[in-house]
């Protein structure tokens, strides 16, 4: 059986409201779950206001209660930005 997944590349206009950006990204994952996508991946993005996801762990955790079957993954964790023990704690 074919399984579909989505990698979130959350590029938004730099002047767009942060809350609106995150809500748009969350709605996309919720829609993917309803369409029976099997997984959703989100990377960590500190580099620009157009990619407003500093913690894929928190972003993914915020979707657990609103999805039924989709699995979550982190596409990128920038270890130079954080202490490895903090990353390990978030991932546990």
Protein language model regions, located:
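N-terminal beta1-alpha1-beta2 module of alpha/beta enzyme domains
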Residues: 1-74
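Glycine-rich anion/phosphate-binding loops
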Residues: 20-23, 80-92
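Conserved strand-turn element in the central/C-terminal portion of the radical SAM core barrel
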Residues: 73-81
């Amino acid at each position: 059986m074919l399984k579909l997944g989505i990698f979130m590349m959350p590029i938004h206009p730099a002047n767009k409201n942060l809350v609106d950006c995150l809500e748009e990204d969350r709605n996309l994952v919720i829609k993917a779950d309803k369409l029976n996508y099997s997984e959703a991946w989100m990377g960590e993005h500190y580099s620009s206001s157009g990619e407003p996801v500093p913690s894929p762990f928190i972003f993914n955790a915020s979707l657990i209660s609103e999805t039924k079957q989709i699995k979550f993954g982190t596409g990128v964790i920038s270890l130079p930005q954080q202490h490895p023990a903090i990353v390990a704690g978030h991932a546990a």
